[in-house]
């Protein structure tokens, strides 16, 4: 019963966060016609590396998509499960930056796992980078992934900065991340890991 109640509570909070963001987006309905609304939605419930805990980030995609359509978004790109490799995510970001114009509204949503990594450039006080986990990223170093498949906060910053420069100060960039980057934000103990989006295991 406790697990069921936790899942219901978690799903409610996720829906509430998304609802609040969409209400925020609806506030831009009265903007000039030249302003274009673009969205990138990434949702993961399955991973190539099966050692990742079970989550349902892919289920967020249709919910968010439906709300964005109601908010009259012009273009919505979705990457779900095996589509959401690091290469495809980065490509989607770059294409979004390429197509974006001054004053556009950009909405980016990521639902999936997160993980800390050892900081490689010394810009983090705690010595750790946070990262999104694409479909092809592994929890532990292996022949298939030595960390290059993770999407670090440094990389995300570069990708977002490109978009921000294109839309300018008159544009709006909204980023929603439903993931646990360090493994400390959990709703329950290890026996209920199916609702934990992340890991407290650092990628070394």
Locations of regions flagged by a protein language model:
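N-terminal secretory signal peptides that target proteins for export/translocation
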Residues: 1-14
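Bacterial N-terminal signal peptides
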Residues: 15-27
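Boundary at the C-terminal end of the N-terminal hydrophobic targeting segment
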Residues: 32-34
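Caspase-like (clan CD) cysteine peptidase catalytic core
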Residues: 36, 75, 87-111, 116-188
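Conserved beta-strand elements of the Class I
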Residues: 38-40
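Glycine- and acidic-residue-enriched helix-capping/strand-helix junction motifs
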Residues: 47-62
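A generic structural signal for short, well-ordered alpha-helical segments in conserved domains
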Residues: 61-65, 76
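Short beta-strand elements in bilobed, periplasmic/extracellular small-molecule ligand-binding domains
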Residues: 70-79
């Amino acid at each position: 019963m406790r697990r069921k109640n936790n899942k219901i509570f978690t799903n409610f909070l996720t829906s509430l966060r998304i609802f609040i963001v969409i209400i925020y987006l609806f506030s831009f309905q009265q903007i000039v016609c030249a302003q274009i609304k673009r969205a990138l939605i990434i949702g993961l419930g399955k991973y190539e590396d099966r050692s990742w805990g079970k989550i349902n980030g892919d289920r967020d995609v249709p919910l968010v998509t439906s709300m964005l359509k109601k908010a009259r978004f012009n273009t919505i790109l979705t990457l779900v499960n095996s589509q959401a490799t690091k290469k495809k995510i980065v490509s989607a970001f770059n294409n979004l930056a390429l197509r974006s114009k001054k004053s556009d509204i950009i909405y980016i949503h990521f639902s999936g796992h997160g993980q800390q990594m050892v900081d490689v450039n010394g810009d983090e006080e705690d010595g750790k980078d946070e990262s999104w986990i694409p479909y092809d990223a592994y929890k532990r170093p292996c022949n298939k992934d030595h960390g290059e498949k993770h999407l670090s906060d440094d990389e995300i910053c570069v990708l977002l900065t490109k978009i921000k420069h294109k839309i300018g100060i008159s544009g709006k960039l909204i980023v929603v991340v439903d993931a646990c980057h360090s493994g400390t934000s959990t709703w329950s103990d290890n026996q209920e890991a199916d609702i934990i989006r992340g890991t407290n295991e650092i990628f070394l």
